[in-house]
UniProtKB/Swiss-Prot annotation:
Protein name (database record): NADH-quinone oxidoreductase subunit N
InterPro entries, A to Z: NADH-Q_OxRdtase_suN/2 (IPR010096), ND/Mrp_TM (IPR001750)
Subcellular location, record wording: Cell inner membrane
Catalytic function, reaction form: a quinone + NADH + 5 H(+)(in) = a quinol + NAD(+) + 4 H(+)(out)
Class in the EC hierarchy, top level: translocase
Organism: Shewanella woodyi (strain ATCC 51908 / MS32)
Taxonomic classification: Bacteria, Pseudomonadati, Pseudomonadota, Gammaproteobacteria, Alteromonadales
Keyword Transferase recorded: no
Function: NDH-1 shuttles electrons from NADH, via FMN and iron-sulfur (Fe-S) centers, to quinones in the respiratory chain. The immediate electron acceptor for the enzyme in this species is believed to be ubiquinone. Couples the redox reaction to proton translocation (for every two electrons transferred, four hydrogen ions are translocated across the cytoplasmic membrane), and thus conserves the redox energy in a proton gradient.
């Protein structure tokens, strides 16, 4: 067995150890450390494998790109894990250990999706991740909103899986193979205008659109974000979407879909609709979680533009480096910023409404400053990491002469600026009621880390960009 499987094996061992701990003697502190140890060792092993040669078998492919995405995933998980112990002690009375177990199972599924190269391995790891998230979302079983969110996510997951299974079956009927690469070769070498083949592809895409909550498959996404426990919402918006988007990227990057105008038109329409509708719906919200839910729709709409670049001209497949760089930079920038946002919200004791943030600048200035920087980064304001992500996106579009989405991107960004600034204005409002207790040294350190990371990489992006370029190249 190849060493490339080591991170997944380490997480699997952590899952087994945690199961024994839960069965023999419950201990929240021990479960916390077992989870963290598993994630940290898996991340270190994944980093050590970045320089290893490309490895592929029938079900999985390990490349430098998948390695970096796996490190990004594990890094997000570790950062969120650091906040978990305190949050669970405050908000969950019983069965805290199961949260860590479900987190590790979801992590294992997400890692498998990132390296999947076959529809069989993709679907099994997708279901492992999705079923784990059902438990995580409905974890606060004493709260009706959490139970409702869990049922809604279960229904959406079932619908997405049904679409994907139907699409996979149709594609297999046409090609006789379930490999991603074979699908790409089939698109390149045969006539992809067959309506049955195209129908299969569209079914698969619809399933992935549900997983990414893109328009028009964004039903209940805000309800799920608001009803789930806050750490689950953080995991759902980062880990789940990263894994799902990587699969979508693979399908478009492996083959030239230029001849299949139906699929390309679908992606273009979904991208524009997600950019505009996501931000317009966010304008109407009074909950910070609902705002982040709808803004995530628009951000992944922006990312769809980069998928479109891979197939706008056939020559792109001979030199795909810059679109790939832009995609990896924007995806990393958005997920890092969003992880920072949820990390800050987990430290605050208020509710999920914007009112809970009123006067935060006067009671907890460091929390407010870090959350403001996160909002400015999500809005794409200069000197932040989010701005550099949008700069890469626009530069790639102009370089490859795909400029038609840019007016929609500008309009959507202007709309988004209003609700991001609204959050900052609420925090600047005067209030007479103080927020929670004094900050611990750990909280202060993590808040400064978020500020320095977003501002540092936004002001001096060369190191981050060069790292991405070396990986993609």
């Amino acid at each position: 067995m190849s060493l490339h499987y080591l991170p997944a094996i380490i997480i699997s061992i952590a899952i087994l150890v945690l199961l024994l701990v839960i069965a023999l003697k419950r201990n929240h502190q021990l479960a916390f450390y077992i989870t963290g140890t598993g994630l940290c060792i898996a991340c270190v092993s994944q980093c050590s494998l970045l320089s290893a040669s490309h490895f592929s078998d029938e079900l999985f492919t390990f490349s430098s790109m998948s390695g970096v995405l796996s490190v990004l995933l594990l890094g997000i998980l570790i950062f969120l894990w650091l906040q978990l112990h305190t949050w669970l002690e405050k908000h969950e009375a019983n069965h805290k250990e199961e949260f860590y177990l479900l987190l590790l199972l979801a992590s294992l599924g997400a890692l498998g999706m990132i390296v999947s190269e076959h529809f069989a391995s993709f679907f099994l790891t997708l279901e492992l991740m999705s079923l784990s998230f059902v438990g995580l979302i409905a974890y606060s079983h004493s709260q009706l909103s959490s139970q409702e969110a869990g049922v809604k996510y279960l229904i959406l997951s079932a619908v997405a899986s049904a679409f994907m299974l139907m699409g996979i079956a149709i594609v297999y009927l046409q090609t006789g193979n379930l490999s991603f690469q074979y699908l790409a070769d089939n698109v390149n070498n045969t006539n992809p205008s067959s309506m049955l083949f195209t129908a299969g592809l569209i079914f698969i895409l619809i399933g992935l659109l549900f997983k990414l909550s893109l328009v028009p498959c964004h039903l209940w996404v805000a309800d799920i974000f608001e009803g789930a426990p806050l750490p689950t919402t953080a995991l759902l918006s980062t880990v789940s979407k990263l894994a799902s988007f990587v699969v979508l990227w693979k399908l478009f990057h492996l083959g030239n879909w230029q001849e299949n105008q139906i699929v390309l038109t679908l992606i273009g329409v979904v991208a524009v609709a997600s950019m505009l509708i996501g931000n317009l719906l966010a304008l109407l919200q009074n909950s910070i979680l609902r705002i982040l839910a709808f803004s995530s729709i628009s951000h992944f709409g922006y990312l769809l533009i980069l998928l479109f670049l891979f197939n706008h001209n056939a020559d792109l497949l001979d030199n795909p480096t810059f679109p790939l760089e832009a995609l990896l930079f924007y995806l990393s920038a958005y997920l890092i910023t969003l992880t920072g946002a949820f990390s800050i919200l987990m430290k605050l004791e208020g509710g999920k409404s914007l009112e809970a943030l009123t006067g935060l600048f006067w009671s907890k200035p460091l929390h407010a400053a870090s959350l403001s920087i996160v909002m400015l980064s999500l809005a794409g304001i200069p000197l932040t990491l989010g701005f550099m992500g949008k700069f890469y996106l626009v530069t790639a579009s102009v370089s490859y002469q795909v400029t038609w989405p840019l007016p929609f991107l500008v309009i959507a960004s202007v709309i988004g600026l209003f609700f991001y600034l609204r959050v900052i204005m609420v925090m600047l409002s005067a209030t007479q009621s103080p927020h929670s207790s004094p900050s611990t040294s750990g909280e202060v350190a993590s808040l400064w880390f978020i500020i320095l990371l977003i501002m540092g990489l936004g002001t001096f992006p060369a190191l981050f960009a060069d790292t991405i370029k070396s990986v993609v190249g």
